[in-house]
C-alpha cells in the first residue's frame, strides 16, 4: 500500500541512517545483501554510501561471520503484509491522536518486525494468554506500547478490543500508557523504565532453559519456546541492559532473540549527541550472535532471514539490529525526535495517510487484514491442544517429573511443604538471621520444585547457597544456584522475569541491604508487576560494624515500607525468619524483602511462625485487662533490646508488653479488633526501637510515643560500640519508658 513518495522517503532516510552508521565504528557488521523486498529500491548514491561504509569498517577490525544469505520464501502475500503493517501503524497513530498523548514513532518504525513476529513466527493461543508453552514477547521500549496493543488486537486477544484502543491512556482502560502485565492479558511483563524489559526477557529465557533442562526427555520436549524482545537506543544506554545481557551471553540463552530498534533518535535529538559506541561489537563481546538488518522499514525478507538464522544459533542469544526510521511514513516528522513522544497532529496524520496510501477511517482495520489474522485463533487452539496431548503422554511415562512440572506451571505448592521449615526454642544456639535464613532456603529447596536463586557475588556473606544443588551455568542449566556476579540491578529484573514466567517459579536474590540502592528500580517493578520475588537482604544495620556507613543501611527500611505491594520483613530470630519465608513463598503476587543480621542473635521466648503471619504480635506481657503501663515495640536485632528493657522495667514494678513488629504491611491487613489487642488505643506510653531511620514510626507509637533509632549515617567501628554511641541500648529504652511515669 506504500505510495511512490513514501518509498522514496523511506530510502532517503534509510540511506541517511546507514551512512550515519558509517560515520563511526557502529556499522561494522556485515548485513544481509541480495534480498529484495516488495518496493525496496535503494538509490545509486545510497548503495555507494553503504559500500563506502563497509569498506571503511573493514579496515577497522576483522569481519565477523557474515549472516547467512538466502532467498526466503515469504509465508504471506506481500500485499497483505504491507496492508497489515500499515494497519498496525495507523492503529497506533489513531490511538495516540485520540488520547492526545503517547509515542507513535516506535510503532510506526517497528511495525514490520513486529508483524512478522506475531503473524508468522510466534506460537501463542489468543484465547488463552497463559498457555504455558507459548512464546514470550517483551516490549522493552515500553513507551511504544501501542505497537503491542495493536498486535494483540489483530491477533484476537479478548483483552484488547477496538474500544480498548480508543480508550488508550484513559482511566480504567486495559491500554495504559506503558505495558502492564497485571492489567492486560497477553502482556508478559511490565515495562516502561528503559532496560527493565530486556532484563525481564533474560529472566524469561533463563526460566525456559532451566525447565527444559530439568524436564525434557529425548522422546518428549514439553518445554520448548522462545523469548523475543524489542529494545531501543534508550534501553541500550541503561546500565541494567548491559548487566542482564552480559549474563544472557554467559549463560548461553540460545532461545532469547532480541530486536534492537536502531533508529538513531532519542528524546533530546540524534543519538550522536550521547551514544556513539559500537553496539554490535559490545554484544559480540558479551557472547551474543549479532545480525544487522539494514532495511527495517520494508525489508520483510531480511527480517525473516535474520530470525531464521537466529534460530540456528542454539548456544548463545541473538541480537538482531534492525535499522528503522522512527515515525516511518510521516512526511514531515519521520526520523526526528518530535515523533517520539507526541501525537502527530491532525494535519500530519492526514499527510501520513496520503503518503502511505491509507484510505481507511481511524481505528478501521480492513476486512482482508482481519480475515488474514483471524487464523491465529484456531491455530493457537490447535497448538495448545497438541501440546496438552504431548504432556498427557509425558505424564503417563514420567509421572514424577510431570508432577513437579505441573506444580511449577500452576503454582500449587506440594502438600505439607511448610513443615520443612525449621523451628527453634529459646534453648537453641543463637545465630545470625542470615545463617538462619540459609537453613530455611535449603529446607525449602528440597520440597518446593520451583525454588531457585542466588546472590550478587555475595553468596558466602548472604548465606544463600543451596547446598543440595549445583550452579546454573551454560552446561548445567538444570541446577538452581544462580551466580549473578556484581550486577544487583540486572539480578532483580532477571528474577522478575523468572517469577512471571510461571506461577510456581519462586526466585530469590541476595545482596547487602544497603545495595538495594543499586536495584531499587527492579524492586519497584516487582511490586508493580506483582512478581513474587524474595529479596534476601543481609547486613541490615550498623550491626555489620567496621565496614562503615557506606555499607550500613539507615533509610532503607522506611523507604520499602513506603513502597506499595511490598512486604518488608525484619525478623528477630529463627522462628521469625522461618515465618517470613512461609509468608514469602505463599505471596506469589507480592515481593518480600527480608532484612537479616550479620551479628548473632538469641532465639527469644514468645516468637513464632504464626505471630509473623500477623505482622505484629505480643511476645511477652505481664499486664492485665489489655492495659500495660508501657508497650515496647522492636524489630530484628532490637527486639532483644526491647525484651531486656522490659525485664528492667518489670523489676521496677511496671507492667510491660513487648511487641514484635516484624512486618508492618501484614499488621495493617489485620482486623481492627486484632490491632486493638496488640496496641490498645488507650495506652499512649509506647516506645519503638529499631537501628534505622525513625521515619514512619509515629503512626505506630502515636503522638505521645517515643522512637529510638538512627537519623544520621553510621560509622566505622565494632558493632557493640556503634550501638552504644548511637544510643541503641537497653538503657535508652528504659529511660524513654520512664519518661511516661
Curated annotation (Swiss-Prot):
Keywords assigned by UniProt, alphabetized: Acetylation, Calcium, Chloroplast, Magnesium, Metal-binding, Phosphoprotein, Plastid, Thiamine pyrophosphate, Transferase, Transit peptide
Obligatory cofactor(s): Mg(2+); Ca(2+); Mn(2+); Co(2+)
Record's signal peptide: none
Active-site annotation: 488
Domain of life, source organism: Eukaryota
InterPro entries: THDP-binding, Transketo_C/PFOR_II, Transketolase-like_C_2, Transketolase-like_Pyr-bd, Transketolase_bac-like, Transketolase_BS, Transketolase_CS, Transketolase_fam
Pfam families, per the entry: Transket_pyr, Transketolase_C_1, Transketolase_N
Binding site for Mg(2+): 233, 263, 265
Enzyme nomenclature, EC number: 2.2.1.1
Residues the record lists as Phosphoserine modifications: 428
Pathway stated in the Swiss-Prot or TrEMBL entry: Carbohydrate biosynthesis; Calvin cycle
Name by which UniProt lists this protein: Transketolase-1, chloroplastic
Residues the entry annotates as binding thiamine diphosphate: 143, 192-194, 234, 263, 340, 488, 515
UniProt GO cellular component terms: chloroplast; chloroplast envelope; chloroplast stroma; cytosol; plastid
Lineage: Eukaryota, Viridiplantae, Streptophyta, Embryophyta, Tracheophyta
Subunit structure: Homodimer.
Cofactor comment text: Binds 1 Mg(2+) ion per subunit. Can also utilize other divalent metal cations, such as Ca(2+), Mn(2+) and Co(2+). Binds 1 thiamine pyrophosphate per subunit.
Species annotation: Arabidopsis thaliana
Gene induction: Up-regulated by salt, sorbitol, and abscisic acid (ABA).
Cited function: Catalyzes the reversible transfer of a two-carbon ketol group from fructose-6-phosphate or sedoheptulose-7-phosphate to glyceraldehyde-3-phosphate to yield xylulose-5-phosphate and erythrose-4-phosphate or ribose-5-phosphate, respectively. Could act as a stress sensor involved in adaptation process.
Amino acid at each position: 500500500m506504500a505510495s511512490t513518495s513514501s518509498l522514496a522517503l523511506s530510502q532517503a532516510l534509510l540511506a541517511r541512517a546507514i551512512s550515519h552508521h558509517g560515520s563511526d565504528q557502529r556499522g561494522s557488521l556485515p548485513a544481509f545483501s541480495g534480498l529484495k523486498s516488495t518496493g525496496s529500491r535503494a538509490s545509486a548514491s545510497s548503495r555507494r554510501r553503504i559500500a563506502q561504509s563497509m569498506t571503511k569498517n573493514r579496515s577497522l577490525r576483522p569481519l565477523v561471520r557474515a549472516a547467512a544469505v538466502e532467498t526466503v520464501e515469504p509465508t504471506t502475500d506481500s500485499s497483505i503484509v504491507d496492508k497489515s503493517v500499515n494497519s498496525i501503524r495507523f492503529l497506533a497513530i489513531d490511538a495516540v491522536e485520540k488520547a492526545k498523548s503517547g509515542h507513535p514513532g516506535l510503532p510506526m518504525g517497528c511495525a514490520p518486525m513486529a508483524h512478522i513476529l506475531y503473524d508468522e513466527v510466534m506460537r501463542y493461543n489468543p484465547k488463552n494468554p497463559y498457555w504455558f508453552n507459548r512464546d514470550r514477547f517483551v516490549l522493552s521500549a515500553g513507551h511504544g506500547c501501542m505497537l503491542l496493543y495493536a498486535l494483540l488486537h489483530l491477533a484476537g486477544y479478548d483483552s484488547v478490543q477496538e474500544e480498548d484502543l480508543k480508550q488508550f491512556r484513559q482511566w480504567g482502560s486495559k491500554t495504559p500508557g506503558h505495558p502492564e502485565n497485571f492489567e492486560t492479558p497477553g502482556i508478559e511483563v511490565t515495562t516502561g523504565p528503559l532496560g527493565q524489559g530486556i532484563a525481564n526477557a533474560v529472566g524469561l529465557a533463563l526460566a525456559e532453559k532451566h525447565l527444559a533442562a530439568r524436564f525434557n526427555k529425548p522422546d518428549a520436549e514439553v518445554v520448548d519456546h522462545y523469548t523475543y524482545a524489542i529494545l531501543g537506543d534508550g534501553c541500550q544506554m541503561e546500565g541494567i541492559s548491559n548487566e542482564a545481557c552480559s549474563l544472557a551471553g554467559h549463560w548461553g540463552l540460545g532461545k532469547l532473540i532480541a530486536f534492537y530498534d536502531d533508529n538513531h533518535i532519542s528524546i533530546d535529538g540524534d543519538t550522536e549527541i550521547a551514544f556513539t559506541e559500537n553496539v554490535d561489537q559490545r554484544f559480540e563481546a558479551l557472547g551474543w550472535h549479532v545480525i544487522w538488518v539494514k532495511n527495517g522499514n520494508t525489508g520483510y525478507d531480511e527480517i525473516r532471514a535474520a530470525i531464521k538464522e537466529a534460530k540456528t544459533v542454539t548456544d548463545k542469544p541473538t541480537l538482531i539490529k534492525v535499522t528503522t526510521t522512527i515515525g516511518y511514513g510521516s512526511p514531515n516528522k519521520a526520523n526526528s525526535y518530535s515523533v517520539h513522544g507526541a501525537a502527530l497532529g491532525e494535519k500530519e496524520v492526514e499527510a501520513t495517510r496520503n503518503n502511505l496510501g491509507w484510505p481507511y477511517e481511524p481505528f478501521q482495520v480492513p476486512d482482508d487484514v482481519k480475515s488474514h489474522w483471524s487464523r491465529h485463533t484456531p491455530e493457537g487452539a490447535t497448538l495448545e491442544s497438541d501440546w496438552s496431548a504431548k504432556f498427557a503422554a509425558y505424564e503417563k511415562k514420567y509421572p514424577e517429573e510431570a508432577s513437579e512440572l505441573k506444580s511449577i506451571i500452576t503454582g500449587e505448592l506440594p502438600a505439607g511443604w511448610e513443615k520443612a521449615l525449621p523451628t527453634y526454642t529459646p534453648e537453641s544456639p543463637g545465630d545470625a538471621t542470615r545463617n538462619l535464613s540459609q537453613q530455611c532456603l535449603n529446607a525449602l529447596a528440597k520440597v518446593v520444585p520451583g525454588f531457585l536463586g542466588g546472590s550478587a557475588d555475595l553468596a558466602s556473606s548472604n548465606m544463600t547457597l543451596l547446598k543440595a544443588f549445583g550452579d546454573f551455568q551454560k552446561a548445567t542449566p538444570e541446577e538452581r544456584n544462580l551466580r549473578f556476579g556484581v550486577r544487583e540491578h540486572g539480578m532483580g529484573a532477571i528474577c522478575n522475569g523468572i517469577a512471571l514466567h510461571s506461577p510456581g517459579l519462586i526466585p530469590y536474590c541476595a545482596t547487602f541491604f544497603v545495595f538495594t540502592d543499586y536495584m531499587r528500580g527492579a524492586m519497584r517493578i516487582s511490586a508493580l508487576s506483582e512478581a513474587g520475588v524474595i529479596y534476601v537482604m543481609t547486613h541490615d544495620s550498623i550491626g555489620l560494624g567496621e565496614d562503615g556507613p557506606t555499607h550500613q543501611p539507615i533509610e532503607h527500611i522506611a523507604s520499602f515500607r513506603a513502597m506499595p505491594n511490598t512486604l518488608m520483613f525484619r525478623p528477630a530470630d529463627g522462628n521469625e525468619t522461618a515465618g517470613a519465608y512461609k509468608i514469602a513463598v505463599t505471596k506469589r503476587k507480592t515481593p518480600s524483602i527480608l532484612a537479616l543480621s550479620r551479628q548473632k542473635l538469641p532465639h527469644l521466648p514468645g516468637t513464632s511462625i504464626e505471630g509473623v503471619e500477623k505482622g505484629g504480635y505480643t511476645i511477652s506481657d505481664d499486664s492485665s485487662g489489655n492495659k500495660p503501663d508501657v508497650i515496647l515495640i522492636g524489630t530484628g536485632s532490637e527486639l532483644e533490646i526491647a525484651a531486656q528493657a522490659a525485664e528492667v522495667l518489670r523489676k521496677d514494678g511496671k507492667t510491660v508488653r513487648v511487641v514484635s513488629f516484624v512486618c508492618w504491611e501484614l499488621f495493617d491487613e489485620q482486623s481492627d479488633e486484632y490491632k486493638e489487642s496488640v496496641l490498645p488505643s488507650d495506652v499512649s506510653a509506647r516506645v519503638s526501637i529499631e537501628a534505622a531511620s525513625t521515619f514512619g514510626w509515629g503512626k505506630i507509637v502515636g503522638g505521645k510515643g517515643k522512637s529510638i533509632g538512627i537519623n544520621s549515617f553510621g560509622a566505622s567501628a565494632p558493632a557493640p560500640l556503634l550501638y552504644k554511641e548511637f544510643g541503641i541500648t537497653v538503657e535508652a529504652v528504659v529511660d524513654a519508658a520512664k519518661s511516661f511515669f
